[in-house]
Regions:
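Generic structural signal for hydrophobic
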Residues: 36-37, 61, 88, 109, ...
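Hydrophobic faces of well-ordered beta-strands that scaffold small-molecule active sites
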Residues: 18-22, 45-47, 74-77, 96-97, ...
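Conserved N-terminal beta1-alpha1 strand-loop-helix module at the mouth
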Residues: 1-74, 79-83, 87-91, 200-222
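Glycine-enriched alpha-helix->loop->beta-strand junction motifs that scaffold or abut catalytic
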Residues: 41-43, 68, 89-96, 110-117, ...
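Glycine/Thr-rich beta-alpha phosphate-binding loop at enzyme active sites
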Residues: 43-51, 84, 89-91, 112, ...
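Generic hydrophobic/aromatic pocket-lining and core-packing "Φ" positions
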Residues: 34, 58, 85, 106, ...
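Catalytic cores of alpha/beta
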Residues: 81-91, 124-132, 169-186
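Glycine-rich phosphate-binding active-site loops on the catalytic face of alpha/beta enzymes
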Residues: 43, 95-105, 139-146, 182-203
Length: 224
């Protein structure tokens, strides 16, 4: 069962401005990644459902976060059907992120009052997801749509909260483009939690990178 309400999850996304996301098939390494991000100031994390036994690793992460990382909100991404969403909910997921909009996922998450974010790539998809209660839409693929898309939809849809995933990098200019366009937060994957960092187990570098990126985002949000 989720430890955090959908309101608490949304609030954390809005306040931090960044949702780190990753997948790794080893529980021990995944815990160290989560801890490094936590030590860097992150209080929300998306574990992507992209490999064999991902649910087992996720379950270990949730238990670890509850026991050792107070205030860390862990959710799941890359969910493509209601059955998978239900399995992760039972494992303690605090939110669900999908690459596409699906009514079955929306219904099961709403039934349990769990925060969910649907992957959308058009204003029609965004409007439909919001009709089903989606508070924050995942803009995907962000590298294809770009900040200009966000700025354009904010005209007719100023109430829409957006989290782009893909196409978001650590560079100041890139982050500035996204936040100037009106995003609520950004999803940050391999640009933040790189293969090199994982391979070399350079968790201190990950901590420092998370800390620096959060500070950059905070400064950009304050200037708006």
């Amino acid at each position: 069962m989720a430890q955090y309400s959908r309101i608490q999850v949304i609030k954390q996304m809005e306040e931090s401005g960044m949702v780190p996301l990753f997948y790794h098939g080893d529980s021990s390494i995944s815990k160290q990644i989560l801890k490094a991000c936590y030590d860097g100031g992150a209080r929300i994390m998306e574990f992507t459902n992209r490999g064999d036994f991902a649910l087992e690793v996720f379950t270990d992460l949730i238990k670890y976060a509850i026991a050792e990382l107070p205030g860390m909100i862990v959710g799941v991404g890359s969910i493509t059907d209601a059955k998978a969403a239900s399995q992760y909910m039972l494992a303690g997921a605090n939110f669900v992120v999908t690459p596409v909009f699906r009514e079955d996922i929306a219904r099961i998450c709403n039934r349990r009052k769990l925060m969910w974010s649907a992957g959308c790539s058009s204003l029609t998809e965004i409007a439909t997801a919001e009709e089903f209660g989606c508070e924050l839409v995942k803009l995907f693929p962000g590298d294809v749509l770009g900040p200009g898309f966000v700025k354009s939809i904010k005209g007719p849809h100023p109430w829409t909260s957006v989290m782009p995933t893909g196409g978001v990098s650590l560079e100041y200019d890139n982050l500035k483009l996204w936040f100037d366009s009106g995003v609520t937060c950004v999803g940050m994957g391999s640009k933040l939690i790189s293969e090199d960092i994982i391979a070399n187990k350079n968790y201190n570098l990950l901590k420092e990178t998370v800390e620096k990126t959060l500070k950059t985002i905070k400064s950009l949000k304050q200037k708006k």
